């Protein structure tokens, strides 16, 4: 951590917002500042640049660029950064905080960023290009989508699910570090913020991939069910046409009835031949004639049935292929109760054996929402019985009737498989909704934190510009109060939508900013209006920390603002050269405040110059 005007060696140990209070006791010509965040140049734009954080949490883009401040690093920079981090051995927390490859900053390099060689076409392959930290734009939408999630390319569903746990673990560590660095007033807080945004972006991409995977699975299964239902309806229509061909009703064409009557008469004639040998010759001639007519009728029936049979076979072939794909997929995934034996049993159960055919039954199309145990089969001549005979002719005609029935019988029983597919569809739909909700939560949290960090960054840039144009602390208080109000509004909406991570991070940020406001109020004699505003913020912050403390065990607002927990905050509001240390180790700020009062009087009287 360095001083606001970094070239000096005062070692105030401050960062962020508190750097801007140090200008009261240092000359800008002798110091420089290391900035982490920025805000647009004019305080009048605070409302325009405040985070637009509503129920859908849309991403906010800047009204216009302010020089090069806020420019996002190229996407390849983050990809190489993640690749380098994945190849590194596991480090302890302290080693990880000081590992230059773990974050954008290079230690002791005047706040410069390391950019991969592929982005610098004018540099050598071994020397990285330097990228100034002021060129980071927290509010830029280019950050979203430029960071690749772990194992997101070519990975299966299990690897994506494992990445969710890994990213959530990394995110919890980043939030803990963010809280720790804020309390310690460490310059690594910007690194923690960037890690939070990076991991949130990666998590949102992984959850989006999981959501898309389950959505695709559900759509595939739904498409199969829709096709099966369509094919079953078409099959029902064809079977109805078959039934009409075989019908013996008066409104039918009479071929089936004719066939049955001819067969019966042939049998009766044969009986007459046995009883009346005197009429044997005439009856045999008649019998041959009836047989020929019966065979002709049989040929007509078979010809009419052939097209329908082929159409049904094509439909059932498509059904079988679709069902085989589903069963194979379920078996390969080893989900739930699925195994190879069950898959084989399901496929064998699809085929209807000829021995299962009866003469009197009806077929109905499949109902997707209801699974039945047995398949009803279409038949002919439900109310017609052939005459009994002791010779072979009766059995031959009976077999012919069964053959007709078998041709009109569907050969594929899809009821059990439809029930299984419907069950899998419900499970995939439930997973789809679950991960869509988690994806929305992470996306909203990411949007809220990116906008809040951008607001803090732009505010600090605005405060820096104030140090070069005014010595009035009212400008500081007004600008910081506006920033606190915007952050409190974002925190309130995060609480409304149960974005716990965003609430905790914003509570830490608001607490640190609030400590600076308290110190400004203690060091000046301005109106009570500003103090009232700070008190109002204090009350809301106190409630916020009371809720957050139950889950995260954060220190209370009183302990967070005491000199024991934030000594670097008070050091940041007064230069080391003008402060005095008491016997107990506390800092006396009266000397610095008196010096500021004298300088202020000289400037107002016009007797001194700016150097004085």
Curated annotation (Swiss-Prot):
Keywords: Autophagy, Coiled coil, Cytoplasm, Cytoplasmic vesicle, Membrane, Protein transport, Transport, Vacuole. Residues 214-296 form a coiled coil. It is found in: Cytoplasm; Vacuole membrane; Cytoplasmic vesicle membrane. It is a peripheral membrane protein. Disulfide bonds: none annotated. Induction: Expression is induced by methanol and glucose. Its main location: cytoplasm. Required for the autophagic degradation of peroxisomes called pexophagy, but not essential for general autophagy. Involved in resistance to elevated pH. Belongs to the ATG28 family. Interacts with ATG35. This is Autophagy-related protein 28.
């Amino acid at each position: 951590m360095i001083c606001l005007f970094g070239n000096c060696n005062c070692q105030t140990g401050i960062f962020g917002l508190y750097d801007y209070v140090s200008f009261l006791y240092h000359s800008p010509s002798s110091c420089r500042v290391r900035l982490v965040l920025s805000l647009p140049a004019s305080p009048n734009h605070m409302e325009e640049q405040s985070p637009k954080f509503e129920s859908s949490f849309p991403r906010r883009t800047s009204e216009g660029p302010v020089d090069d401040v806020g420019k996002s690093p190229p996407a390849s920079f983050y990809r190489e950064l993640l690749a380098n981090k994945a190849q590194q051995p596991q480090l302890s927390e302290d080693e990880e905080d000081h590992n230059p490859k773990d974050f954008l900053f290079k230690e002791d390099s005047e706040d410069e960023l390391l950019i991969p060689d592929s982005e610098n076409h004018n540099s050598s392959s071994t020397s990285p290009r330097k990228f100034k930290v002021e060129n980071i734009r927290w509010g830029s939408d280019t950050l979203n989508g430029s960071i690749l999630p772990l194992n997101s390319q070519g990975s299966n569903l299990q690897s994506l699910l494992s990445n969710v746990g890994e990213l959530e673990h990394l995110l919890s560590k980043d939030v803990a570090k963010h809280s720790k660095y804020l309390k310690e007033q460490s310059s690594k807080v910007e690194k923690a913020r960037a890690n939070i945004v990076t991991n949130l972006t990666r998590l949102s991409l992984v959850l989006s991939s999981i959501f898309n995977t389950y959505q695709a699975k559900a759509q595939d299964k739904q498409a199969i069910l829709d096709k099966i239902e369509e094919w079953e309806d078409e099959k029902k229509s064809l079977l109805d046409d078959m039934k009409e061909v075989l019908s013996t009703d008066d409104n039918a064409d009479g071929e089936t009835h004719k066939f049955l009557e001819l067969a019966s008469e042939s049998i009766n004639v044969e009986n007459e031949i046995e009883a009346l040998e005197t009429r044997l010759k005439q009856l045999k001639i008649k019998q041959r004639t009836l047989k020929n007519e019966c065979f002709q009728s049989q040929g007509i029936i078979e010809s009419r049935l052939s097209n329908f049979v082929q159409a049904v076979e094509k439909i059932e072939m498509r059904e079988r292929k679709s069902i085989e794909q589903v069963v194979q997929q379920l078996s390969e995934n080893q989900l739930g109760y699925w195994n190879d034996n069950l898959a084989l049993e399901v496929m064998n159960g699809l085929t209807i054996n000829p021995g299962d055919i009866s003469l009197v039954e009806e077929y109905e199309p499949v109902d997707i929402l209801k699974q039945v145990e047995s398949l009803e089969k279409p038949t002919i001549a439900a109310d017609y019985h052939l005459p009994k005979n002791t010779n072979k002719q009766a059995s031959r005609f009976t077999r012919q009737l069964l053959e007709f029935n078998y041709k009109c019988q569907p050969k594929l029983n899809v009821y059990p498989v439809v029930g299984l597919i419907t069950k899998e569809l419900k499970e995939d739909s439930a997973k789809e909704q679950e991960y869509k909700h988690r994806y929305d939560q992470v996306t909203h949290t990411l949007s809220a934190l990116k906008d809040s960090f951008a607001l803090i960054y732009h505010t600090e840039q605005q405060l820096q510009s104030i140090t070069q144009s005014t010595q009035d602390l009212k400008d500081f208080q007004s600008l910081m109060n506006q920033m606190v109000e915007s952050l409190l509004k974002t925190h309130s909406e995060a609480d409304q939508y149960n974005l716990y991570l965003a609430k905790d991070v914003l509570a830490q940020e608001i607490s640190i900013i609030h400590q600076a406001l308290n110190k400004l109020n203690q060091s000046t004699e301005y109106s009570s209006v500003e103090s009232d505003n700070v008190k109002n913020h204090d009350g809301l912050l106190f409630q916020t920390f009371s809720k957050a403390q139950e889950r995260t065990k954060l220190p209370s607002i009183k302990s967070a603002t005491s000199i024991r927990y934030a000594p670097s905050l008070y050091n940041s509001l007064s230069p080391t050269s003008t402060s005095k240390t008491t016997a107990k180790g506390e800092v006396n700020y009266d000397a610095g405040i008196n010096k500021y009062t004298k300088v202020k009087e000289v400037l107002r009287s016009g007797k001194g110059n700016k150097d004085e």
